Each structure stands twice: as C-alpha cells, then as structure tokens.
Amino acid sequence: HAIKQAQAAGISDILISTDSSEILDTNHANSVRAIKRPDHLATDATPMIEVLTDLVAHHIPDDRLVVLLQPTSPLRRADHIRGAMDVYAHGTFDIVVSAVEMDRSILKAGLLVGNTFNPINKPEYVFSNRQSLPPVYKHNGAIYIFSRDWLHSNQSFDSDRIGLFEMSVAASLDIDNADDFARCEAEILKRDT
C-alpha cells in the first residue's frame, strides 16, 4: 500500500529498506528500489531513526526531501501525503509529521513522584473542564517529512520545529497486532467496494 500511496502522491523516487527476500526479489517499477537492510538494523527492537540514518548516509547522496511512509499505516491516502508535503513546503519546519487529535483529558494527567502529583502540563489544566482544554494531538506514525541533510546532521527526529498534518482517527489506524491487521483489512475492503 505504501508504494501505491507514494506513487499516487507524485513521489518519483521510492526506496524500500527491507530484510524480506520476497520484497527484494520482486520486480519493482523503475521508480522503486528495494535495498537490503543490514542485519543489525533488521530486528524488531531497531529504532526507525537508526534505519533512516543508515539509509540517508548510504543511499541518498544529495539533499532532497525524504518522505517516510511506514507500511503499518495502510489507511493513509495520497491526499494525506500531498497535504503533509504542502505543510512542509509552506512552513519553516525541520520535520512534518502526521497526527491525530486525541482525548484532551490527557492534560489532566500527572506523574507521581513519591507522594507528589506533578502535572505533565500546566497545573490549571488538572482542574479545568475537559471541554475547555486545548486540542491535543498524537503523532500517528503514518507520515514523516524532512530533508536528507537535516536528518544526516541531526541523527534524530528531535526538534523544536515540528509541523503537523492532521489525519482522522479512521485513517490513523496503525497495525501493531493481528486485531489491527484485521480491522485495517476490513476498512480497505469497505473502501475499495
């Protein structure tokens, strides 16, 4: 799905980093290159940032826009990708990520240190009505956009200049387990009929 979504969004140079021999052996279109992921970066515990820093260092030689589309977000659409690219193009961001609005009551939460409740945000939010709290967004992992040189020099996604492209709850479903896969599959079948 990620390849088709990227192509539909107008992305002309697509790299796939994988350890799957099935994907590596597939005859991809000219604009798609499958690259063997080094074994030490092909574990379930490997952070995505390590895979990306290796990819930009060895396979993306010049500064260009990088759009990361994780395969675990199959309900993302081409218009989401184009929208996020537009946010990046018209902002002054180091990175743009897709996100979904979440329950505002998270602003009422805190950390327990000894017997002390330390609010995670402004103390007055703990005692505010939920509906009066500001909107809260959570990165959904569907889209990351950044320049190759920024990631190469930063070696991290950490930044104070993060742009946001909002996606719906339905489009933000992420596959983490078999139940998620079944829900995504049902949504795709419903959408395609």
Residue ranges and their predicted role:
Residues 16-18, 145, 175:
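Short beta-strand scaffold positions
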Residues 18-19, 70, 99:
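Short beta-strand/turn micro-motifs composed of small residues
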Residues 50, 74-161, 166:
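Conserved core of the sugar-phosphate nucleotidyltransferase
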